[in-house]
Design a protein with these regions (language model features):
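Intrinsically disordered, low-complexity Ser/Thr/Pro/Gly-rich regulatory segments
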Residues: 1-214
Length: 214
């Protein structure tokens, strides 16, 4: 479904709310095999909740949380802040942990195996959610990278798969228990967003057909 065709989308005028709506509903730039469904992410209230916030923030700018604008020009951090806000305030969601570190047993247990981006409850189901939000490009769509040439799409894809697999490790389950979260019945899911840029403005067939391009 193309959520941008929803008539309510075009009633959203506040820049931050439109950014949040894009983060919630955009198609994935690549598939991980465990995408979080947009309907699950939006919940029952969906765009109507966004519309209510839009009207409130337009009429009273002081109601917009300051932390949602401080990282606007750092794409990854901005996306993290927006999603954390949604998990904290949407009525169908509950944020249990964010950026939860997972430590290994080497060097006295101080080595970091990774972080779990979010542990959140959505519609009564517990999720370990990993977020990736990237702008990548190349002339042909092959070997895509960000502004830093070492920040390749392939590298990010591999890292994301490792992060999604963290939940199954004993170390991650111990970290969850230490945080007061029972690791049973938690599902790993991804939210992948972004744009792929090529000289032709289109993406190769290996990308999802609805992925955003430019």
């Amino acid at each position: 479904m193309n959520y941008a065709q929803d008539a309510l989308w075009w009633r959203l005028t506040h820049p931050t709310i439109r950014d949040l709506a894009s983060l919630l509903t955009a198609p994935p730039l690549w598939h991980t095999g465990c995408e979080l469904p947009v309907r699950e992410l939006l919940g029952e209230h969906g765009f109507r909740l966004l519309l209510a916030w839009d009207e409130q923030w337009q009429s009273d700018p002081q109601r917009q949380p300051e932390n949602l604008t401080r990282n606007r020009y750092a794409l990854g951090k901005y996306a993290e802040d927006l999603l954390a806000y949604w998990f904290t305030h949407a009525p169908h969601a509950k944020l249990l942990a964010a950026n939860l570190p997972v430590y290994g047993n080497e060097a006295g247990g101080n080595s970091t195996l990774g972080e779990m981006d979010y542990i959140a409850e959505l519609n009564g189901t517990l999720y370990h959610i990993e977020l990736a939000c990237k702008y990548h490009g190349s002339a042909t769509g092959e070997h895509m990278a960000g502004l830093n040439p070492r920040d390749t799409l392939a590298r990010k894809q591999r890292k994301l798969q490792r992060q999604l697999a963290l939940l199954a490790t004993p170390e991650a389950q111990a970290a969850l228990r230490q945080h007061g979260i029972a690791p049973d019945n938690i599902r790993s899911a991804s939210i992948v967003r972004g744009i792929g840029f090529t000289a032709a403005g289109t993406l190769p067939p290996a990308f999802p057909p609805q992925a955003w391009s430019g």
